Amino acid sequence: MRPSKRAADELRPVSLERAVSRYAEGSCLVSFGNTRVLCTASLEERAPPWLRGSGKGWVTAEYAMLPRATHERTRREVGSGKPSGRTQEIQRLIGRSLRAVTNLPAMGERQITIDCDVIQADGGTRTAAITGAWVALHDCFAWMRTRSIISVDPLRDHVAAVSCGLYKGTPVLDLDYAEDSAAETDANFVLTGRGGIVEVQGTAEMEPFTQEQLLELLGLARAGTERLVALQKEAIA
């Protein structure tokens, strides 16, 4: 049995609260159980240097954890002068995931930065961040359209993410920290609303996993992201 008493294919309670920032062009406070991430979208009226003159825009992301997002205080990364390898990996993942469903030329030569700040971490921070970041980006584009900055919605599809893993030999969906720290296999799946695969990250912590187990995890992830996309649609309705 899972520590949370959830069924193998059961998500944690998920909430997507919009417009939580007074100043950001788009914002969302996303909760996956006890994991909470604040996602804000900020518009800049210029593209990165390598895109100037191309007619295309850019969506990028930054990710950070507040010092007391974890059981014990962690030092702010600003003190070390640069983000850790883990932080860089996660923020690139978030950016890639959002760009996969964005029509960049429809943005014009502008950049949107999505800041994902983990308020409380209990496993699955990157997957929660991607799911909430999409809502913040959606609202940023809506803000731009109401002000005639752009004429069409650059978003081509939804994108959401969820973790899956093998816990005591059983494929399970949406691992919390207790499960993640004891799982034999941990994987993250990023999928679009139409079911396209944006990214799969999977690691065997103990024994290697089989192709059949990977497909089982993918099946769980598909069902989970379908529910997350439904929640996104409900949130923006």
Swiss-Prot record:
It comes from the Bacteria. GO terms for biological process: rRNA catabolic process; rRNA processing; tRNA processing. Phosphate binds at R86, G124, T125, R126. SUPFAM superfamilies: Ribonuclease PH domain 2-like (SSF55666), Ribosomal protein S5 domain 2-like (SSF54211). InterPro entries: ExoRNase_PH_dom1, ExoRNase_PH_dom2, ExoRNase_PH_dom2_sf, PNPase/RNase_PH_dom_sf, Ribosomal_Su5_D2-typ_SF, RNase_PH, RNase_PH_bac-type, RNase_PH_CS. Its EC number is 2.7.7.56. Coiled coil: none annotated. GO terms for molecular function: 3'-5'-RNA exonuclease activity; tRNA binding; tRNA nucleotidyltransferase activity. The keyword Lipid metabolism does not apply. Signal peptide: none annotated. The keyword tRNA processing applies. It is an enzyme of class 2 (transferase). Phosphorolytic 3'-5' exoribonuclease that plays an important role in tRNA 3'-end maturation. Removes nucleotide residues following the 3'-CCA terminus of tRNAs; can also add nucleotides to the ends of RNA molecules by using nucleoside diphosphates as substrates, but this may not be physiologically important. Probably plays a role in initiation of 16S rRNA degradation (leading to ribosome degradation) during starvation. Belongs to the RNase PH family. HAMAP family: RNase_PH. This is Ribonuclease PH. It comes from Methylobacterium radiotolerans (strain ATCC 27329 / DSM 1819 / JCM 2831 / NBRC 15690 / NCIMB 10815 / 0-1). The lineage of its organism: Bacteria, Pseudomonadati, Pseudomonadota, Alphaproteobacteria, Hyphomicrobiales.
